[in-house]
Amino acid sequence: VGAGTSDISVTKDGSIIAYGMIPLAGDELTELIVQHYLVDFQTAERIKLASTTGEMITYKDIMMIEHSIPAKEVWELIEPVTDKMTTAVAEKIKELNGGQTVSATFVVGGGGKIHGYTEMLADKLGLPQERVALRGEEVLQEVTFEQPDIEKDPLIVTPIGICLNYYDQKNSFIMVHLNGERIKMYDNN
């Protein structure tokens, strides 16, 4: 669940069997916060992220007036959009899986950290809540960061996966010159 899209992969026996995308994700929530609290996009992002802690959130609106609100107020504001997002994601998952639900769902990305997201998705998929899990640290066990303050959470799972995929596949290509043009080709030995 990224900023602009929610991307979905359905797997079976360790392979991706279907892939889809819906244009609903975290930015929908951020834009709602922008409009409701009269803040800029960056402040709205900070409010959205801070709301995941369940504590008081302090911010300044566009008039530079300081406000403090409970995270629960943000949860109530974004709940209808979170409901819309999880409904669309569940429908797409079922569509990609031949019209039926899946056995389990792993959620990555910042949008999945939103209060109530995994619970709503589980409900719409007809799964027990423990079968819809937000993934983070447990899938990054083999990744070591030089900076000790980097938190292994759902926000970085996809970027790390892209980097590891590139690293694994970088030796699968060779560069050849054909008629004076450099071309990248797959090397299948």
Protein language model regions, located:
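Helical "lid/coupling" subdomains associated with nucleotide-phosphate turnover
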Residues: 7-12, 18-43, 53-188
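Two-metal-ion RNase H-like nuclease active-site motif
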Residues: 1
